[in-house]
């Protein structure tokens, strides 16, 4: 069974220590609920990932663990076969002892767009909401973050993260918790909170913004990336049914509308730092994610539209600061 004891130990003397009043019970219940299904099989695979301390680690320009020279060809093939059990790999890429995990998303491209605009992460306590397999968490660590906590309710994403961490070394202060943000108490403790690719999946986007705000210390920074459409502060797309074949997309605001939502949620210093149309090179099917991808979600005769006729995915990154005092948004 995946253990969270090292996380409890790391936060016991940190700004997150009051979380220990509730977190062990929540995660204990999660473990009891997931004794069956795919998780036990994945945990057996994790227990086979015994490799030497990597001779090189790079989290600053990539997520590279090991040069590939420490393993024989046979050992590298075995590692690749074990990691393949966790398909589909959606966020990456990773290079692990010479095994190149070419994920569906070029998440490094997103990081390169965002990183120049955020406050330096050195010595900061960071929360990544909807962290997926944890690619960006490793890049946050590479920027010098003191603690990085990622939350995502997916057991598969947790096991993908655990696979990478066990090979990299468990001593790194980066942790995955299989939780949704609605399961977090208002911690008021993180220096930086990231929410990337989550807001449009929330039925109540304002509630999500308030949940993000409540995790930040006063003066802390929110980095919000989400799907947007063109328009003024009153423009919001509500898909009638599906958007890009996804049935869990609820609200796509314009940048101006999104900034207004943030202001109403008691954020200040709100600024849009990037708007980018998702390209077919950034999101595509690969050997490590062989299912449908962006090209299958777009109109084959007009890639500026989804198959449903909506504007094709365009993503904006907004940075904002938690205001003082923390008043409840009505």
Swiss-Prot record:
GO terms of molecular function: methyltransferase activity; transferase activity, transferring alkyl or aryl (other than methyl) groups
Signal peptide start and end residues: none
Binding locations of carboxy-S-adenosyl-L-methionine: 91, 105, 110, 130, 152-154, 181-182, 196, 200, 315
EC id: 2.5.1.-
Gene Ontology BP annotations: tRNA wobble uridine modification
Family: Belongs to the class I-like SAM-binding methyltransferase superfamily. CmoB family.
Subunit structure: Homotetramer.
Function: Catalyzes carboxymethyl transfer from carboxy-S-adenosyl-L-methionine (Cx-SAM) to 5-hydroxyuridine (ho5U) to form 5-carboxymethoxyuridine (cmo5U) at position 34 in tRNAs.
Protein name: tRNA U34 carboxymethyltransferase
Protein's organism: Shewanella piezotolerans (strain WP3 / JCM 13877)
Organism ancestry: Bacteria, Pseudomonadati, Pseudomonadota, Gammaproteobacteria, Alteromonadales
């Amino acid at each position: 069974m995946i253990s969270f004891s090292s996380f409890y130990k790391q936060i016991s003397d940190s700004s997150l220590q009051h979380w220990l009043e509730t977190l062990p019970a929540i995660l204990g219940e999660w473990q009891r609920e997931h004794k069956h299904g795919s998780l036990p099989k994945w945990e057996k695979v994790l227990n086979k990932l015994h490799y030497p301390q990597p001779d090189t680690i790079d989290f600053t320009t990539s997520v590279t663990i090991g040069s590939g020279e420490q393993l024989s060809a046979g050992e590298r093939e075995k590692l690749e076969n074990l990691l393949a059990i966790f398909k589909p790999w959606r966020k990456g890429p990773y290079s692990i002892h010479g095994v190149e995990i070419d994920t569906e998303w070029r998440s490094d491209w997103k990081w390169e767009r965002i990183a120049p605009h955020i406050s330096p992460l050195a010595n900061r306590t960071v929360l990544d909401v909807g962290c997926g397999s944890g690619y960006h968490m490793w890049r946050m660590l590479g920027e010098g973050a003191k603690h990085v906590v990622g939350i995502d309710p997916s057991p598969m994403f947790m096991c993908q993260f655990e696979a990478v961490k066990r090979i990299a070394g468990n001593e790194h202060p980066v942790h995955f918790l299989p939780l949704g943000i609605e399961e977090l108490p208002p911690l008021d403790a993180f220096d930086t909170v990231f929410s990337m690719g989550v807001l449009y999946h929330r039925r109540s986007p304002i509630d999500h913004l308030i949940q993000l705000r409540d995790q930040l210390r006063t003066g802390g920074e929110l980095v919000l990336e989400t799907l947007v459409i063109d328009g003024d502060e009153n423009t919001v797309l509500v898909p009638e049914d599906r958007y890009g074949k996804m049935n869990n997309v609820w609200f796509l605001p314009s940048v101006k509308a999104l900034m207004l939502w943030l202001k109403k949620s008691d954020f200040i210093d709100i600024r849009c730092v990037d708007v980018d149309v998702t390209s077919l090179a950034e999101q595509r099917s690969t050997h490590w994610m062989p299912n449908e991808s962006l090209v299958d979600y777009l109109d084959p005769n007009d890639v500026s539209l989804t198959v449903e006729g909506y504007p094709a995915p365009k993503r904006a990154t907004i940075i904002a600061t938690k205001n003082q005092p923390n008043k409840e948004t009505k």
